């Protein structure tokens, strides 16, 4: 399955990044494309862009289901 990220997102990282769930402390190592989507989800949550947030969550459920359960569920 090709991992296309939502349009207009920029991948800034070049190495995988360990991301921590701020509520549970659970951690997941994300590839750079997933970090970009994760950051977009969290930013969309802060500014109330629920449509963008849901698009990002759908991407995570499809491409990173284990990380989704640890970080976003």
Residue ranges and their predicted role:
Residues 1-42:
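N-terminal acidic leader/helix
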């Amino acid at each position: 399955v090709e991992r296309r990220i939502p349009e207009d997102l920029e991948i800034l990282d070049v190495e995988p990044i360990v991301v921590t769930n701020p509520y549970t402390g659970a951690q997941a190592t994300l590839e750079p494309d997933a970090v970009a989507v994760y950051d977009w989800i969290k930013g969309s949550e802060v500014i109330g862009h629920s449509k963008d947030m849901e698009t990002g969550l759908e991407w995570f459920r499809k491409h990173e289901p284990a990380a989704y359960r640890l970080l976003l569920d």
